[in-house]
From Swiss-Prot:
Protein name: Gamma-aminobutyric acid receptor subunit rho-1
Signal sequence coordinates: 1-21
GO terms, molecular function: GABA-A receptor activity; GABA-gated chloride ion channel activity; identical protein binding; ligand-gated monoatomic ion channel activity involved in regulation of presynaptic membrane potential; protein domain specific binding; protein-containing complex binding
Catalysed reaction equations from the record: chloride(in) = chloride(out)
Protein encoded by which gene: GABRR1
Single GO BP term: chloride transmembrane transport
Length: 479
């Protein structure tokens, strides 16, 4: 019975001791700090104590706070993008919004005659004012953004008329820039490469001059909603002085503005970037005109080759004709198949005609020579003194002798060492004088020989003179 009260008394003493210990810790905090120092401060508390000590010890090394870590207002909130409907143009329901444009041409990459297009890389900049994007600023500084903000606000919907391919450069990121002034003025710039159509006239090719245009227009907004204009007039177009092309000389760049009408939608403002190109002729002189001229001159060589040298004259004529055909085919392969005659076609085909006529000239000479040889054979058969002689021994009857030379044979006297064949020819010609019929046969025979020689002789003068005259007329018209 006495054990139960003693147990209760012991429990009471333990509880009272725990209360006293708790009260002592609450009234003596320095002791707790002292005890924690023995076990070690927590990591965060030690860092804070170290920083405070560093600031107190070296105030010179004290750094300003990093503003990027402080909470800032988002650009979307500053521009109040969520408070407006940017699917509508600025000033909707009012007058047309003016949008200025300027362009800097970076490069003119290529001109294709076959596809009738050109490729250009340029910086396209738009200027307009959108009061919905105005923001308060104490220093009147603009804000610059990349392409991510462009998708959240209104921008002009420009496109290139008659473009075949175009893209915005994206290396290393999208080449798009947006700059907003505190009063709401916006600059929108992007770097674009576009391939556009260019209607070319090749009637004077390769002595031609081409004018191409890059046309810029709003796709959806008519002139009642958007007024498109060159911001600085002709100064709105800037070009790099280093721009050059292999086959063309860039003569000038200039700008124009016109209105375009579509029956379904109405009138639109359209901006033009016009540039004039003049073709370099030196390349075509080396590749086309000089080879064609040389082939024509080479065909004239046959006029100085003996008419009996068939293996020499025929291959020469065929070679020049085939070479001219190859030149014509090569030029037309690099050109579009137009339905009109080009200047180079006139020159090449006239040259081809000259080469072909030289072949026909030899065909005529060879034919007349063959006919003449047949008549010679008949004449030898009719002459009694030469009928038994072989053809080489009748060379005295060659047409190189005139009538006077033939008559002089009457006075011919054989000298020592003279062959008797020549004497027989002399006697034959002398006997012909006593017969009027044989005299007429001899005259027609000699005249025939002179005519065949005259074709080659006159061709040596007529062909070069006619070709030189053609060149004078051609270059005076097209140059």
């Amino acid at each position: 019975m006495l054990a139960v009260p003693n147990m209760r008394f012991g429990i009471f003493l333990l509880w009272w001791g725990w209360v006293l210990a708790t009260e002592s810790r609450m009234h003596w905090p320095g002791r707790e700090v002292h005890e924690m120092s023995k076990k070690g401060r927590p990591q965060r508390q030690r860092r804070e104590v170290h920083e405070d000590a560093h600031k107190q010890v070296s105030p010179i090394l004290r750094r300003s706070p990093d503003i990027t870590k402080s909470p800032l207002t988002k650009s979307e909130q500053l521009l109040r993008i969520d408070d407006h409907d940017f699917s509508m143009r600025p000033g909707f329901g009012g007058p047309a919004i003016p949008v200025g444009v300027d362009v800097q041409v970076e490069s003119l990459d290529s001109i294709s005659e076959v596809d009738m297009d050109f490729t250009m890389t340029l910086y396209l900049r738009h200027y307009w004012k959108d009061e919905r994007l105005s923001f308060p600023s104490t220093n009147n500084l603009s804000m610059t953004f990349d392409g991510r903000l462009v998708k959240k606000i209104w921008v002009p919907d420009m496109f290139f008329v008659h473009s075949k391919r175009s893209f915005i450069h994206d290396t290393t990121t999208d080449n798009v820039m947006l700059r907003v002034q505190p009063d709401g003025k916006v600059l929108y710039s992007l770097r674009v490469t576009v391939t556009a159509m260019c209607n070319m006239d090749f009637s004077r090719f390769p002595l031609d001059t081409q004018t191409c245009s890059l046309e810029i227009e709003s796709y959806a907004y008519t002139e009642d909603d958007l007024m498109l204009y060159w911001k600085k007039g002709n100064d709105s177009l800037k070009t790099d002085e280093r721009i050059s092309l292999s086959q063309f000389l860039i003569q000038e760049f200039h700008t124009t503005t016109k209105l375009a009408f579509y029956s379904s939608t109405g009138w639109y403002n359209r901006l033009y970037i016009n540039f004039t190109l003049r073709r370099h002729i030196f390349f075509f002189l080396l590749q086309t005109y000089f080879p064609a001229t040389l082939m024509v001159m080479l065909s004239w060589v046959s006029f100085w080759i003996d008419r009996r040298a068939v293996p020499a004259r025929v291959p020469l004529g065929i070679t020049t004709v085939l070479t001219m055909s190859t030149i014509i085919t090569g030029v037309n392969a690099s050109m579009p198949r137009v339905s009109y005659i080009k200047a180079v076609d006139i020159y090449l085909w006239v040259s081809f005609v000259f080469v072909f006529l030289s072949v026909l000239e030899y065909a005529a000479v060879n034919y007349l020579t063959t006919v003449q040889e047949r008549k010679e054979q008949k004449l030898r058969e009719k002459l009694p003194c030469t009928s038994g002689l072989p053809p080489p021994r009748t060379a005295m009857l060659d047409g190189n002798y005139s009538d006077g030379e033939v008559n002089d044979l009457d006075n011919y006297m054989p000298e020592n060492g003279e062959k008797p064949d020549r004497m027989m020819v002399q006697l034959t010609l002398a006997s012909e004088r006593s017969s009027p019929q044989r005299k007429s046969q001899r005259s027609s025979y000699v005249s025939m020989r002179i005519d065949t020689h005259a074709i080659d002789k006159y061709s040596r003068i007529i062909f070069p003179a006619a070709y030189i005259l053609f060149n004078l007329i051609y270059w005076s018209i097209f140059s």
